[in-house]
Amino acid sequence: MTRRHGWKGLLLVVAALLSACGGSEQESVPDSGLDNSQEVLDFYASRPDLFTFATPADLPADLVWETGMDEPEIGSPEATKGGTYYESIEDFPPTLRFTGPDSNFSSRSWISGFYRMPWVVPHPNTGKYIPGIAESWAVDQANKKVYIRINPTATWTDNEPITSDDALFAFFFYLSEYIQAPFSNNHYSNEYTNITKFDDHTFAITMTTAKPDMAEYALFLGPVPQHFYKELGTDYPERYQWRYEPHAGAYFIDDQNIDMGVRIVLERKQDWWAKDLKYWRYLFNPDRINLSVIRDASNRYEAFRRGDVDMMRVATAEMWYDNLPDSDPDVAGGYIHKSTFYNGGPRSNWGLWMNASRHLLDNQDVRLGIHYAANWQLVIDNYFRGDMERLRTQNDGYPDFTNPDVEPRPFDIALAEQHFAAAGFTQRGPDGILVNAAGERLAFTL
């Protein structure tokens, strides 16, 4: 069972001025005396298998370069840019770092994840590749290699140009023990065998295996700003704790817009390098995004009702139908807009999960019987009031990998009893529970 392919949201349009933010307590300021440039070069030299320096003349002549420019636009030209979007977060971020200790926090997407651009992104509707930082790319499946050309106008949020050196430095960064990120260390160690620089805007990445989705392993990566991490060393977590890493996206955080423990405000770059490019020009419309800490769910709801927060995702039928019904004066009066919309993205794999190594559950007929005995539609109709749809598989929403021919097993007591009988449970005990010849009850605890 999963959420229907859609969201319910409450939209509240308010006109408000953002109060001034300040009082940022930065733990570290840039130290111009530190420069790890030589260490980086030495690392490249020590790994000639991983880092290759070539020339444009070394590029294969038969490469087929793609630009992804034939897909439909994203967003609407009628959307007005400007204003402030007010959002709540459950807790103040423990760090502004994108990598390393404590960096995987609940509001990470709002802080930077929503705005960071990889080399290439999938179109949200067609799933086809469209340009991010890359201007074009070429896939050499036979040699497990992807070639990438950087858009020469691409810049970091601090206005420094993005170059192939930042692509190479990403490998130094994510392989480094300084960042204290074992997953990243492991991923870059095991999935890639080489990165080759051809010029300031052209490079290639070689993967270890030619998987069906091999191209994504290169295209969905992104650069790391080498100039920003010249101070990278053993004190990385502390040194960069409250320093916002430049990225290629539309929003940035200024030190003056950090009110520790209270709020963080992001600002849109008015001269963002991609602001007039297809696929990006109708996105990222607010000038500012105000993230205020509201820890308690009831307080977040009240803040929304007051107009302090612009939108609230509704996760329960009780909230949608009982707490804020269509007859509510604010809804009926047009002050709050309730909206339901659908998408075709990956679904959360909600369901009843069984440990097949446990006693009784290690019998396939028992597991199949449970499938047929579980009345999910009753749960959907009564508990979720019909606002859910059952998953067809445990991983729906992956177009190239989800099998459209798989159907969930229906609620069918007769079939359930057949499978339970095949597992030896043919009689019922005094309490009505099925038992086998040894008197063992077919009962489980969730």
Q: What does each of the following model-derived ranges do?
A:
Residues 78-80, 184-233, 239-241, 250-257:
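Surface-exposed binding/hinge segments that line
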Residues 52-73, 82-141, 172, 246:
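N-terminal lobe/hinge region of extracytoplasmic solute-binding protein
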Residues 176-184, 194-197, 254-265, 292-358, ...:
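Extracellular/periplasmic solute-recognition and catalytic clefts
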Residues 82-91, 135, 145-148, 167-170, ...:
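Short, well-ordered beta-strand elements
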Residues 18-20:
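C-terminal motif of bacterial Sec signal peptides marking the signal peptidase cleavage site
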Residues 104-105, 110-117, 121-125, 220-288, ...:
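Gly/Pro-rich hinge or "lid" segments in bacterial periplasmic/extracellular proteins
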Residues 135-180, 204, 300-303, 360-362:
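Aromatic- and charge-enriched surface segment that lines or borders ligand/interaction sites
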